[in-house]
Amino acid sequence: MYAKSSEKNDGSIGMDKNITVATMQFKEDVKVSSVEYLKTYYTFNIGDIAFEGHQSKDFRYGRFVENDIGNGIVSHIFAVFRPIQEYDLHFWKYAINNEMLMQRILSRSTKASTMMHDLVTNDFLNETFLVPSLDEQKHIGAFFDNLDHLITLHQRKLEKLKILKKACLEKMFV
């Protein structure tokens, strides 16, 4: 599915396109020593994945994060992988963050180091797992995107109701 990417920034991509892997957002306020230092950063295109090795309660061995926000650059400390087969971006965003799927793979392709896990690239690339057809990936990805959209809408509605409740309580007990 993926191949390791070692494509470096040729200097044409500035800090305005720096992507923080932890939150998958563009982060412009990072300080770099020079424009030359930006050439040590990897290019990180839509559909690429990067490994973040921090252990958490949700991700025992670290996690992969898929770039779904736009082409940019990431620090050279992250392993970046580029897709080599056609696949559905939305499906893989959910699949690579599914601990049930990835735990077995990452337990065999990472090694513990100080405060985090390091990915052993060759071990990861030698892992295999069953993948749905492209058509199934599209349906599954769309389903979860729709579900996320519904959750967001209900969260907004809940916030508005909380504000309304607070206002009513304030007026009632004046």
Q: Where do the language-model regions lie?
A:
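Feature detects amphipathic, helix-rich regulatory segments
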Residues: 1-174
